[in-house]
Amino acid sequence: VSLGIRNKGYVTLNSSTITAYTAVDGDQIFANTTANPITVTLPASPAVGSEVTFIDARGTFNSNNLIVNRNSQPINTGTSNLTLTTNGQAFTLVYVDATRGWAFKTNTA
């Protein structure tokens, strides 16, 4: 019996020192885009149920965007990367399957 417990990794990305990062399943990413945009690449071969959470740590997605690179997997069946422009946004993507790809599990702004 699986209890569904995930080993979460908390990652703080500061755009003054890093502008690109590749996420792993379970990451909770606090993105500080004060200085520059940040691109986060989703896992290339995710398992069904894989999750990645994104949080606008400084409320600056409008001035310096967070770009989510889909890494060849669809996002809500789409073939475009996500560009986040809403200050204070926080959301979780969960991997569904090869057709739907990554889907929003939660999305707040």
Spans of model-derived segments:
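Exposed extracellular interaction/assembly regions and N-terminal maturation sites
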Residues: 1-70, 98-109
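Tight coil/turn sites that cap or link beta-strands
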Residues: 26, 71, 86-90
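Short edge-strand/loop segments of extracellular domains
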Residues: 69-78
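Beta-strand-rich interaction surfaces with strong enrichment in secreted/lumenal proteins
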Residues: 79-84
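Extracellular disulfide-bonded cysteine-rich modules/repeats
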Residues: 86-101
